[in-house]
Amino acid sequence: MTQVIEKNNQKRLHLPYLDGLRGLAALYVVLVHVEPSMGGELPLHWLLLVRIMQYGAFSVVSFIVLSGYVLMLPVARSENGHLTGSFINYLKRRARRILPPYYIALLICIFISAVVFVLEQFTSFRWNKLAGAGAFDPHFSWIDVISHLLLVHNLHSSTYLTINPPMWTIATEWQTYFIFPLLLLPIWRCWGLLSVVIISFTIGLIPISFTNGFLASANPWFLGIFTLGMAAADIGFSQKTQLVAIKNSLPWGRLAIIFTGMAVITEWRRLGLHIWINQSFAGLAFACLIIYLTKSIMENKQPPLALQILQHPWAIALGTFSYSLYLTHGPVLVFVRYGLFYLPLSPDMFAAASYVVGTAISLIVAYWFYLFCERPFMSNFLKQRKIKDVLISETSTKN
């Protein structure tokens, strides 16, 4: 892994463990969106698992931190602190990477909704909301469709969780792609890293602090969390004396653990704290973790347990199609649940089948979606990361 970094020091950098982090975070989101209850109370022994699954927002935070980190990497490693190529070329690259799979997944959801609508109009079929509970709803308005097509559905509470609820984060990330080069990078170049983090959090907190929750559905504080990813890249690769000293002096692994604990504690609803607080602590935890793991790789140290897990070929393979998994798992889980709901299953069996069957089918569908709807739009660099090559590499290593 270290050889990859050294060999490509002036070229495009790829840290495989980032794919592992992205993949495991996406898998956790899938598990969070499983609805294991048949409508009544879950058996007591399932409650612990349900509680473990209450931190889905932390996975979304990891995506935002990763986005800031990956976009900032070439800037932090450059000599002039600018993006490679023009602003238009940058947008074209980002659009090609995320928009085609997004729109294909959206059209599939609209098609499913149209089928349900026709069945309800011309047959005795009626969509059972209890059986179809989860991260997809076939009933939505034209406003929902238009806002999703324009990637602005996250800006209003009435649209951001319609159609395919996880998609609201895609809109937030897409909007951040514009803010990054037009606002964040100029601030960073003029006033430095600390200034861009403080200003971004200030901008992000204004809507929820002074406008009665205006734009709260977009989680505007994610702008500040995005800059935490930028900070991780800058600290990790900057040649500035002050940042090098910070990278080499702070206990990043311990800080990641501390901030994780603070994120979990401040998430407790009974404390009455706004969610931006626990999500910001989670963002700090992920940023510190990334600095810690990257530093460990570059210094050829014994890989810590977290790095071993994130660099495992299965985690990396999962990360390869994690975007497809994120886009498609909502409808898949809902239809698996719909089918299981009418089977003569006990609450225990229903919960177990919801997790096992729902997750398995979500992975299968996501992989095929990746092959036909995501991979064709990837850059040649990303296309080289084939899942079978990762797994073959694991087998040859063991042998």
Regions inferred by a protein language model and the residue ranges of each:
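Alpha-helical transmembrane segments in multi-pass integral membrane proteins
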Residues: T2-Y17, L27, L31-G56, M72-F87, ...
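Membrane-interfacial loop-to-helix junctions in multi-pass inner-membrane proteins
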Residues: R12-L15, H82-Y103, F122-F136, T176
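Alpha-helical transmembrane segments and their helix-entry boundary regions
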Residues: L18, Y90, I98, T169, ...
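Residues within membrane-spanning alpha-helices of integral membrane proteins
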Residues: D19, G23-A26, S67, L99-L106, ...
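Hydrophobic alpha-helical transmembrane bundles that constitute the permease/transmembrane domains
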Residues: G20-G23, V34, Y55, W174, ...
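His/acidic/aromatic-lined binding-pocket segments of jelly-roll/cupin-type domains
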Residues: V61-F63, G224
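Membrane-interface helix-loop-helix regions
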Residues: Y102-I170, L205, A282-K295
